[in-house]
Amino acid sequence: MSSLAFNYIVNLLSHREYSEFELRNKMQEKNFSEEEIDEALSRCQAKNWQSDRRFSENYLNSRAQKGYGVGRIRQELRQLKGVSSDIIDEVLMESEIDWYEMAENLLRKKFPNYNEQQTPKMKQKIWQYMLSHGFRSDEFADLIGQNQSEWD
């Protein structure tokens, strides 16, 4: 095994967590062979220095703190980070995040003056904002109908 490949991965992992997909891409950019990549990754995973599950848990918590919902986080993990759907599903099921409460807090923060007499245009703007942040309509639709006194 190439100690250069192994040392490269260890150096990357010493700074932050990476998904296996991200590490593979970085190593391919440095022109390591597939064999070197596989061996170095296997060694790091055997030592539990790299784990897609742990990466996903950390990523979920980080993105949730920034106000993103399940849909957006799931999409990013799958498409951008290359994490398997099985791992994503497990991590989301074990998460103790209250997505409804998060949607409510995000709505209050972004639209503090909202009340149910708002124009349809404003309701559409809120709807689009929440969907773009990865919340399902059932997580925020009834919040749009709440009156201002419930937000205070």
UniProtKB/Swiss-Prot annotation:
It is found in: Cytoplasm. The keyword Nucleotidyltransferase does not apply. Keywords: Cytoplasm. Its main location: cytoplasm. The keyword Cytoplasm applies. One of its GO terms (cellular component) is cytoplasm. It holds the Pfam family RecX_HTH3. Gene3D superfamilies: Winged helix-like DNA-binding domain superfamily/Winged helix DNA-binding domain. InterPro entries: RecX_HTH_1st, RecX_HTH_2nd, RecX_HTH_3rd, Regulatory_RecX, WH-like_DNA-bd_sf. One of its GO terms (biological process) is regulation of DNA repair. NCBIfam families: PRK00117.3-3. Belongs to the RecX family. Modulates RecA activity. This is Regulatory protein RecX.
